[in-house]
Swiss-Prot record:
It is found in: Cytoplasm. GO terms for molecular function: urocanate hydratase activity. It comes from Halobacterium salinarum (strain ATCC 700922 / JCM 11081 / NRC-1). Residues 1-22 are annotated as: Disordered. This is Probable urocanate hydratase. Residues 1-15 have a biased composition (Low complexity). Pathway: Amino-acid degradation; L-histidine degradation into L-glutamate; N-formimidoyl-L-glutamate from L-histidine: step 2/3.
Amino acid sequence: MDTPSAAAETSEPSAQWQAYRGAPTGTDIECEGWRQEAALRMLNNNLDPEVAEDPENLVVYGGTGQAARSWDAYDAILDELRTLADAETLLVQSGKPVGVFETHERAPSVLIANSNLVGNWADWEQFHELEAEGKIMYGQMTAGSWAYIGTQGIIQGTFETLAELARDHYPDNDGLRGKIVATAGLGGMGGAQPLAVTMNHGVCIAAEVDEARIDRRIETGYCMERTDDLGEAIERATAAAEAGDPYSVGVHGNAADVLEGMLDRDFVPDVVTDQTSAHDELAGYYPSGYTVADADELRDEDPDAYREASMDTMARHVAAVLAMQDAGAVAFEYGNNIRGQVAAHRGDVTTTAGESHDPFDFPGFVPAYIRPLFCRGKGPFRWVALSGNPADIHRTDRAVTELFPEKDDLHRWIDLAQEHVQFQGLPSRVCWLGYCAADDDLTERARFAVRINELVDNGEIEAPIVVTRDHLDAGSVASPNRETEAMRDGTDAVADWPILNALLNTAAGADIVSVHNGGGVGIGNSLHTNNHVVLDGSDAAAETARRVFTTDPGMGVIRHADAGYADALVEADASGVTVPMRDAEREQ
């Protein structure tokens, strides 16, 4: 079988991409309007060398998550966007433009479907065969939907998860102060972990097999130091924890080897998790016993042998996490489906202490820490300054804190982000906002979006702002091993909800709507959606914002209300969300 992403690797990078090397900036546009221009800039921002993990191969993050199927497809998308009329919609099928239709001026400019296969065919083997033939692309989540903003995109979610963990497990502590978190994976998503730990005043030891990724996180301020010596890392981390100082160190090494090395030294961290690309055993996860270069060569020459070595390492990795949990560590899976991978391919694991475990004997992060937020429609809301001017984001920082003076956590987050988070590509910001309709009937997200639109209209912001989000959101995902794990009513695998989310946001007039399969957890394991709204200062943009930022978080409320979550039912009552067929059993 050919190597994954072969279609993207067979051609040199596009001359257009080499000319751009990131998104155009400023107030001059090359498209018919700002809605089309926003799509062009967001696509190019995804492939900015400051943003993407491997832009020359169209890979944005997450192993093989691409922004376009091939360089020819990338060029064709740009060509179509430049001539796309306000009343037309471009269709993109797995990173390739396949059609333009006349619709109407408030219809989406772009509709995207990535990586979707019919149920019985939705697995990596079938996907890789089609990918090698150039017929499909892995869009991950925000890679193929042109909404990735670099590591900042996940940083607040990681920060919030760890803050909730600290509240649950160390209620009398100052966050994670004095606690050591052991983790792995410092790619585009996992690279947020060290900074999220130190923002919570803790200490982080992060294993990463690729030295370049550690160095990149240090350069961007997400990780403090690196070492090849695990003993040295443990010594530094222990000293920092005892002093109560935030600290992070990247350890060059395989995740399983590093965790087992900790156990061999009788070192048990307070918290253990990981964000390796375990969702893809062939193109994402690296097996033990190989350098990166040697593993890449094995993948090319003998993919089956690579898979076996990768799965063997994953089983050891999970066994080490469970051994640490048995020894008192707080353990959770951070959404990469490593438990599901090991359960499917290796079954139960045995720890070094001889204990047998089901890989699912430690929880996922959503049921453990995030679901109460989802019940209130709260999730990762992000916005991007198309001007390229950081001052535009700084103005929105002030706006969001002015709008929500009562939200101490939000104010703390904005302060921390301004201090610690470097912009990658177009300046951007992320914060978690929810439904929580106010007296004016606007949700939190809608209130803020309308305010941004006013700032664009009155010239306080130089150029339009794109508002988008992660696919990981309250009502936009079906992922039984992640966002919808352990749903109260057993509807973990029901995929109607993200489909309804995409349909509803299309009806509400979002400027880009996308539907993907497999992001974060691998092909066949999830279905999820994304949307963009372009705030250009117009009355039409304000109306779109009011609609989309009501329907989108509202889907989170009704999805969880339908599953019987009391918090969601309370939110529905408080905010006037209509939930038909409510009965007494639902409110128990």
